Amino acid sequence: MKKVVIRECPDYTPDHVKTTLKESLEALGGLEKWIKPGDLVFLKVNLLTGKEPKEAVTTHPQLVKALTELLMELGALVILGDSPAGPFLQGRMRKIYQLTGMTTVAKETGASLNWNLESDPVYFSAGYRLKDFHVMKAIKEADHIINVSKMKTHSMTMMTGAVKNMFGIMPGLKKAELHFRFTDPIEFGHAMVDICEYASPVISIMDGIEAMEGAGPSAGDVVKNGMILVSEDPYSLDIVASEHMGIKPDSVPTLKAARQRNLCQSLEKVTLDTSLGEGIKKSFKLPDTREPDFLEKYGRWPVVGSIFKQISRKHLRPKPVVNPKKCTKCKECYTICPAEAIDMLEKVPGFRYDKCIRCYCCQEVCPEKAIWIYRPKILKWFGGTK
């Protein structure tokens, strides 16, 4: 059975974070179980976009600093990095490192920031959907990867945690291409699992001290959550996190895909080492992107199901909408859209919904939270959503 450790940590006070993180890791055998002096360790943090730590969009720098210090105490060499949404360019990375606090972490600890923006093609024979793809060159050069994710809801995948965090080893706009290639959520989930399996992080850590609910992964609301989660198995870690957030594992494409491949166990088969006295359950507000599930109810009647499917795709699917009062015409959404379904109409984004693949990358990268998801109220009448 896989083990997941949860420890309470009320805030980002340095002593609280470092002590809690060290205790969590010791419950799994300590960092020395995986790391030796001289090892080059890549900390794959979540740096989705250039947001300050208080917005809970990215892995908090205090957790990254504590982990870096623990690694350096063992004699490891540490490099911090991610390939955020959008172009993978030095100027963009400099801004993101500064805003997210990673520049400060590097200065205070002596860790390196990843400035190697090159990528290498890899062949992964065990991939279910992905065998040939590109990864950051810095990932290949590291001895070990440690996965340092953020607990958040996600408009496309319901939650983003340890497994999806590894998507960031794929450089820049290559990620957008993958969205367009795998428009079905479960197929996309398999691709995420392929990348996670290739990366094989030695340990996965989740920043759940402050989390995000609602319109995640970037436009949601901050939740004071007070916990750090650690596991050697990213799938078990995500299962526990999904249970805590009130999300059914099978509604998370990465977990459903992992289950289909026998990589993921049920919560009952996870060994849970927790300091929480009242259990782990807590319901998060979920994204408004859930699609109607009544097709499954009527699926036994092909003709009826076909009619409902056509109606659903045209009239009942959630869709991104722009708030013109918040939009600054920065064109981030236009640049990122993998389906090229956005036009700049008088410099304000306009959506061609017949082309939109509902990946919600546009909402994800919008710096002003100007894109929201419209979800027809009539969906509630059908008694359920995915």
Predicted regions and their residues:
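Extended, alpha-helix-rich binding/interface surfaces that flank or overlap catalytic cores
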Residues: 357-358
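N-terminal and secondary-structure boundary signal
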Residues: 1-328, 334-339, 343-348, 353, ...
